[in-house]
């Protein structure tokens, strides 16, 4: 199936952030079989998975991977998906039935280059709240993975499944259920939900999704360490966000921490908003979240947020004042009441405030 067809027929049915964050840098090819578990938001009859071999945004200091880096050539031997159940101890049952997925009719694929790719549709007949086990087997030296994924991930080693993150994961779990609105959230670890417990789905994007009509789909494109200036390059990551009808944009923290000035951040946000509008989509622009930012960066934090609340925000379709919702009272507005990466309590408060605005 072509990616263009994927976007026509499929929309996100999982609110967990799942991305291409870092490239492995193995000296020689390695064999890996990995598993990751996802919870489905609404269920559906047919599904397909979307992948990319290109890094979405710069990881940490950039020494391992920067935005738009492309993975090497690697062999994808198999991808399987099956419905399973989460046990009280947090582990998962073995799926009774695994579906072996295909890529243009073939069960294997040689992956190379920067173009996204997807599986063919497969029947799943899933219900809302069902969990799925995603399993991939591959051989390669340089391929993407999600280091800060907030989902349970494992590798098969000597017959045992051990915690492990270094294997590719889908950037969307797509369902062909009928939806009336596609809502996307692009941002950093705060958007991804890195301050919440693994596999809890208590991050604010998930809590917003829970309060929206069932006919809406929600796609969390948040990634740890992400920068607005990477999204402003207008490559694969922002291109995915622009497949949504409404794009929520939440950047600034990592830009400030990496030395970006207020004027640079403002210019990047203008670029992002304009690009989304050129695609014919709506934008909800967030103020820069509260964080433990000191020195000159703190001054820039106030300047950028003043601009977002003013003329910059006027270029968007709406503004959500995230900073005011989670920030401390003056003079410490730049610090969060609910930890720098919002915990579950803070995420629920943010979600409630967002839903109360009735943006759409």
Report each predicted region and the residues it spans:
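Conserved SGNH/GDSL esterase-like catalytic core that processes O-acyl groups on lipids
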Residues: 180-271, 292-302, 336-342
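Alpha/beta-hydrolase-fold catalytic nucleophile elbow
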Residues: 250, 286-287
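A short helix->loop->beta-strand "cap" motif at the edges of active sites that frequently abuts
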Residues: 279-283
């Amino acid at each position: 199936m072509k990616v263009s067809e994927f976007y026509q027929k499929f929309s996100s049915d999982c609110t967990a952030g799942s991305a291409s964050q870092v490239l492995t840098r193995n000296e020689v090819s390695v064999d890996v079989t990995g598993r990751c578990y996802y919870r489905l938001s609404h269920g559906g009859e047919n599904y397909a998975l979307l992948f990319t071999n290109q890094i979405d945004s710069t990881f940490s200091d950039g020494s391992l991977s920067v935005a738009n880096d492309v993975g090497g050539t690697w062999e994808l031997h198999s991808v399987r998906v099956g419905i399973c159940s989460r046990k009280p101890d947090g582990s998962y049952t073995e799926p009774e039935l695994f579906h072996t997925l295909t890529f243009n009719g073939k069960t294997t694929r040689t992956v190379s280059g920067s173009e996204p790719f997807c599986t063919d549709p497969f029947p799943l007949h899933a219900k809302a709240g069902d969990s799925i086990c995603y399993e991939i087997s591959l051989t390669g030296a340089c391929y993407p993975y999600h280091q800060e994924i907030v989902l349970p991930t494992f590798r098969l080693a000597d017959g045992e499944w051990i915690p492990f993150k270094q294997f590719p994961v889908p950037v969307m779990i797509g369902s062909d259920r009928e939806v009336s609105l596609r809502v996307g959230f692009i941002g950093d670890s705060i958007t991804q939900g890195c301050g919440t417990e693994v596999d809890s789905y208590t991050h604010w994007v998930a809590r917003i999704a829970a309060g929206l009509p069932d006919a809406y789909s929600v796609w969390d494109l948040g990634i740890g360490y992400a920068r607005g200036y990477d999204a402003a390059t207008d490559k694969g990551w922002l291109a995915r966000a622009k497949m949504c009808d409404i794009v929520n944009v939440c950047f600034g923290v990592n830009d400030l921490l990496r030395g970006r000035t207020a004027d640079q951040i403002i210019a990047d946000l203008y670029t992002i908003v304009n690009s989304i509008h050129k695609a014919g989509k709506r934008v909800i622009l967030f103020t820069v979240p509260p964080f433990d930012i000191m020195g000159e960066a703190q001054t820039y934090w106030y300047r950028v947020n003043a601009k977002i609340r003013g003329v910059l925000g006027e270029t968007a379709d709406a503004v959500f004042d995230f900073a005011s919702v989670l920030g401390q009272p003056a003079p410490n507005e730049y610090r969060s009441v609910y930890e720098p990466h919002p915990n579950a309590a803070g995420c629920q408060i943010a979600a409630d405030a967002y839903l109360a605005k009735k943006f759409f």
